Regions:
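C-terminal segments that line or cap access tunnels to active or ligand-binding sites in enzymes
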Residues: 205, 215-355
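Conserved beta-strand segments of alpha/beta enzyme cores
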Residues: 6, 31, 56, 188-192, ...
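Structural/interface elements that position substrates and couple domains in central-metabolism enzymes
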Residues: 49-50, 125, 242, 254
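Active-site/ligand-binding neighborhood in enzyme catalytic cores
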Residues: 66-73, 79-207, 218
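Glycine-rich FAD pyrophosphate-binding loop
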Residues: 1-26
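A conserved beta-strand/loop capping segment in the N-terminal third of enzymes
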Residues: 21-33, 40-94, 153-158
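Conserved beta-strand termini and adjacent loop/short-helix elements that scaffold enzyme active sites
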Residues: 60-62, 192-196, 262, 319
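Short hydrophobic core segments
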Residues: 10, 204-215
């Protein structure tokens, strides 16, 4: 729109902002992260400065805890976690050597998530913090998942319990939905809500940027890609329920993956009552909103067929987590979108082919 194009944004839901939608809970007055916690973090200054235009951002450090059979510990695994878990008082070098001795010595190149974990941290820490959580989150054995999933959870040999190491970490003071509404507040932008995408709509536009699931866009004609979906069990409590925003639950004795207390995601606000949601993961079925692309071997083979379908046309670009079938954080999606807008406008001005994806899906 800022480049002079009339833009029509269509969303199948009755609100903008997608999975990062936030809304004020009527019963408690707490700002709710409706589709689970979203903490913005980035070291990309261009992304950070772009977002400053559309809302007030409050500094926020995400300090996640894990409830295990041995007690509650900090994540990511850090020096405090290690000393507390093993009942030791090691320094950084001692702990590094200790974990190295725990690590599996017979795994050279990890073939899956379990082998990656065993190679990095050994069986005790893996069993306590990752195995059960992975089974519940992904609905399959960790040996069926690629090794690179575990790279999102580093081990630190200091007392830093900040979940992220990004330079900018914050939450929007008035919620993500307000930020997105401000982005869309432009005379060349028209928004239509509660309208599912239909292939016939494509004829109405010179170009379509599709952020929905790539397989759904083609009517699942090549088959369904694997996704995980989420659902939540809500409860309201007086006062402070758990003392922190997020507690992961990696044990298999409870079916939920984590517990979120929304008031702690707005620490600048004051509320007497507290909204708590227990989060559950499930396989995506017809009618479910997809959240996490699984990207198993069979999915990648199927994805290649959908990519070929995309490459056979020229007036549709697939964007975001679902459009590229990749696990992406918010800051990555925004960076990709800014880069894509620049590249698309440049290609349009030259009369050259437009980009087909905001990020290569394969």
């Amino acid at each position: 729109a800022e480049a002079g194009f009339d833009t029509h944004v269509i969303d199948q839901r009755d609100h903008v902002a997608g999975h990062c939608h936030s809304a004020r809970d009527a019963e408690t007055g707490v700002m709710e992260h409706v589709y689970g916690p979203h903490i913005f973090h980035t070291s990309n200054d261009a992304v950070w400065h772009y977002l400053q235009r559309f809302g007030e951002w409050m500094p926020f450090v995400n300090r996640v805890k894990a409830r295990t059979a041995r007690g509650i510990f900090s994540l990511p695994i850090n020096l405090h976690t290690i000393n507390q878990f093993f009942g030791t008082a090691m320094g950084p070098d001692e702990a590094r050597a200790f974990v190295a001795r725990l690590a599996a010595q017979d795994i050279d190149v990890p073939a899956n998530l379990e082998e990656q974990a065993l190679k990095f941290i050994g069986r005790d820490l893996y069993e306590a913090f990752f195995r059960g959580y992975t089974i519940k989150q992904w609905g399959c054995d960790p040996t069926e998942l690629p090794a690179d999933i575990l790279k999102r959870l580093p081990v630190r040999f200091n007392y830093d319990d900040n979940y992220y190491d990004s330079r900018h970490q914050a939450l929007p003071k008035h919620g993500y939905t307000r930020v997105v509404e401000n982005i869309l507040d432009h005379p060349r932008v028209h928004v239509t809500l509660a309208t599912p995408w239909d292939a016939a709509m494509q004829r109405e536009f010179a170009h379509v940027f599709h952020s929905g699931a790539i397989d759904a866009c083609f009517g699942f004609s090549e088959g369904r890609l694997g996704y995980r979906s989420m659902h939540w069990q809500r409860s309201v409590h007086d006062g402070d329920y758990q003392g922190t925003a997020i507690i992961n639950c990696p044990t298999l004795d409870v079916p939920w993956t984590r517990v979120l207390e929304h008031r702690h995601l707005s620490p600048w606000a004051s509320c007497e009552r507290s909204l708590v949601t227990h989060e559950f993961s499930k396989e995506t079925e017809a009618g479910d909103l997809p959240f996490y692309p699984k990207r198993l071997a069979a999915d990648r083979e199927l994805l290649a067929r959908y990519v070929a379908r995309v490459e056979a046309q020229r007036n549709m670009t697939f964007i975001g987590r679902l459009g590229t079938y990749r696990y992406l954080d918010m800051h990555q999606v925004i960076a990709d979108a800014l880069d894509l807008a620049r590249d698309w406008c440049a290609a349009h001005a030259r009369g050259a082919p437009r980009p087909l994806f905001s990020r290569p899906p394969l």
